[in-house]
Amino acid sequence: DTQPAEWNDYWTKLSTLAAGNSLPECLQMDYSYLAQYVAADLLVDLTPYVENGTLDVSNVSEGIQDASSIDGKMYAVCAGVNAPALFYNKTLLDSLGITVKDNMTVDEFESIAREVYEKSGVKTDLPYSAGDNYLPYAMRAHGVTKLFNEDSLNVTDAASLVPGFQIYEDGVKDGWVIGADVHAELTSNSVEQSPLVYFSSEATQSWCGFFWSNQLSAMVAAAPEGMEIGI
């Protein structure tokens, strides 16, 4: 018997179950929450089951196993891996004669965003709540390859951080970035409520969205009829 839920609702529900000591025997976990649940002694150490052969992870790479482990103990079995992805309205961009290439720089992305806005009035949706994925990529363009060190942000001054936030300020001021006021009325991180597929006007519509590669099928399903989603 499974009990699926939308992303935010899922973690709220799981937290409630954890507080009541009534977590299910098997649950889906995310890397960003793993340490928190282990620290609260809510997850079983699976290492003995790997060692006695009950769990066969021989075909799982060491790096993937490490992602499921805390302090050398395995607390989860990886169900799959994915990567941050840019989804975009291919139908719109094709009509505007704009091509999205792989491995864009931040400057190239901004150039496309401005061109889309100038030609169509459609804006760009930059991550607000999911900025922990976007910000490291923006910072990497300025030589910062790791967001945090052991004690703090892995920067000596704000110079490396500013460009990642400056694009928001400049974009909102110039009109091509969707403002936080639009997101305030949406469910955070929801595919179905992404401005890429959920909008009422050009002011609330985006030509793109930052998500995870394994959410492509959900985004395609949520897209309005006639909209092709590119990745």
PLM regions and their residue ranges:
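Short, solvent-exposed loop/beta-turn-alpha elements that line the ligand-binding surface or hinge
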Residues: 47-60, 102, 125, 145-166, ...
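Short helices/loops that flank or line small-molecule/ion binding pockets
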Residues: 11-23, 93, 111-115, 188-209
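Short glycine- and hydrophobic/aromatic-rich loop-to-beta-strand nucleating segment
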Residues: 84-88
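Early extracytoplasmic/lumenal segment of secretory-pathway proteins
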Residues: 1-32
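Hinge/lid segment of periplasmic solute-binding proteins
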Residues: 31-83, 107
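A ligand-binding cleft/hinge motif common to bilobed small-molecule-binding domains
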Residues: 34-38, 212-227
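Glycine-centered hinge/linker elements that transmit conformational signals in sensory
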Residues: 113-114, 153-190
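Extracytoplasmic/periplasmic substrate-recognition and gating elements
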Residues: 96, 174, 221-231
